[in-house]
């Protein structure tokens, strides 16, 4: 009976020892594999293996490899559309070669100056008749009575007339002087300004006075 108990006890202790040794072997193998995997072959920021089984010393990475290749390589997410500005020149869209860059009388700006044609004319029509050239200067600068500005002065025709009609009648010229300057007079009554022609004003005034006397 005692002998049987000793055999059972010996068998039980042997199983415990075998299981412990097997566990120790497994733990040692896992630790060895982890150490060998973590110190894997990293080539310049390249294939960093993350603890997988390396076959024959090669770079078998079970994890993801870093994309940064040493000394160049392609950078993911690079700009697919390079800037269109060419170094040292390039063609500016819309401009034409030759002395008449804006010969089609296009509207354009350079700095703070804007206008039509080669000489920044105030309108396409002015550019078409040669604004800024020798054939445009003189008395026919604004012969079509166009509205234009020079600095802070704006008006119609050659002499900055207040309206196109006055420019057509010769505003600012000798034939215009004294003709249309004071054709109306203003009378203020009860805060209301009335623009009445001079002759009519005197006739109405005389008629009113005559009716009062009667």
Swiss-Prot record:
Keywords: Cell membrane, Glycoprotein, GPI-anchor, Lipoprotein, Membrane, Secreted, Signal
Residues listed as glycosylation sites in the UniProt record: 182
Signal peptide location: 1-18
A single GO cellular-component term on record: plasma membrane
Span list, region Disordered: 36-101
Lipidation (GPI-anchor amidated glycine): 191
Chain residues in the propeptide: 192-214
Subcellular localization(s) per the UniProt record: Secreted; Cell membrane
Compositional bias annotation for Gly residues: 42-60
Membrane topology: Lipid-anchor; GPI-anchor
Low complexity bias: start-end ranges: 76-85
Major location (coarse): secreted
Induction and repression of expression: Induced by HAP43.
Function per UniProt: Predicted GPI-anchored protein which may have a role during host infection.
Family of this protein: Belongs to the PGA37 family.
Protein's name according to its UniProt entry: Predicted GPI-anchored protein 57
């Amino acid at each position: 009976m005692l002998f049987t108990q000793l055999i059972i006890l010996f068998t039980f202790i042997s199983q415990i020892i075998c299981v412990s040794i097997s566990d120790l072997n497994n733990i040692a193998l896992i630790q060895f594999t982890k150490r060998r995997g973590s110190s894997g072959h990293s080539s310049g920021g390249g294939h960093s293996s993350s603890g997988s089984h390396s076959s024959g010393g090669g770079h078998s990475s079970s994890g993801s490899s870093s994309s940064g290749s040493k000394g160049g390589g392609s950078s993911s997410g690079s700009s697919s559309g390079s800037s269109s500005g060419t170094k040292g020149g390039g063609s500016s869209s819309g401009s034409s070669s030759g002395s008449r860059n804006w010969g089609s009388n296009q509207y354009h700006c350079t700095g703070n100056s804007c206008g039509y044609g080669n000489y920044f004319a105030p309108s396409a029509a002015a550019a078409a008749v040669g604004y800024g050239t020798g054939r445009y200067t003189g008395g026919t600068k604004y012969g079509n009575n166009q509205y234009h500005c020079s600095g802070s002065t704006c008006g119609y025709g050659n002499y900055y007339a207040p309206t196109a009609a006055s420019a057509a009648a010769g505003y600012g010229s000798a034939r215009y002087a004294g003709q249309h300057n004071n054709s109306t007079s203003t009378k203020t009554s009860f805060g209301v300004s009335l623009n009445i022609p001079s002759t009519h004003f005197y006739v109405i005034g005389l008629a009113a006075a005559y009716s009062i006397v009667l």
